[in-house]
Amino acid sequence: QELRALPSRHEFDCDYRSGHLWTSVLPRRVGLLTEWQHEASHKWGHDGLRFIPREQLSEWVASERYQAGLFDPEGGHLNPLKLALGLAAAIEGAGGRIHEQSKALGYREEGGRYVVTTEHGRIRADVLVLACNAYLDRLDPKLSSCVLPVGTYQVATAPLSEEQATALLPSNVC
């Protein structure tokens, strides 16, 4: 919810689109989608997942390969570069400073503030954001043991016209 609110609160666009669609190519895996739906509802109270049978998938994705789908209206996709640039502009607009290309070697709390040691000096801050992906090993070994790396997969094509994109993904889900 916060990710959806940030762009409008700070007046930037990151091409956020609601909705995520899991699909199954293999008939034997269709049952997993219904298991996920059941688990999400009963374990986490997430009742919004919707099972999409093969007959209805053409409304979502222009492919005959998929056997079934599971739609999550709470998921979504965005342009990560636009998000990063928008957040950076919001931070700087609020008086914050961003220290790029400053490898953090360590940090500590001191007098209610943070002191970050870099290769070229120290940075003092009231707020510290560890935006290090899953690679915190040397910076914060304790926190690193709590982080699970997540794979991200992206595909790039030649730019598609609006008409081509809509033909491939009529639902505009990822």
What are the language-model segments listed below?
Residues Q1-A90:
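Rossmann-like flavin
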Residues S8, A89-H99, R124:
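Secondary-structure boundary elements
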Residues G19, S102, H120:
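Short, well-ordered beta-to-alpha junction loops that form the rim of enzyme active sites
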Residues L49-F51, I98, Q154, C174:
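Conserved beta-strand scaffold positions in the cores of enzyme catalytic domains, especially
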Residues F51-S63, R97-Y114:
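A conserved short coil-to-beta-strand element within the FAD-binding core of flavoproteins
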Residues L81, A94-R97, R108, A131:
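Extended non-membrane alpha-helical scaffolds
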Residues G106-C174:
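Flavin-dependent oxidoreductases
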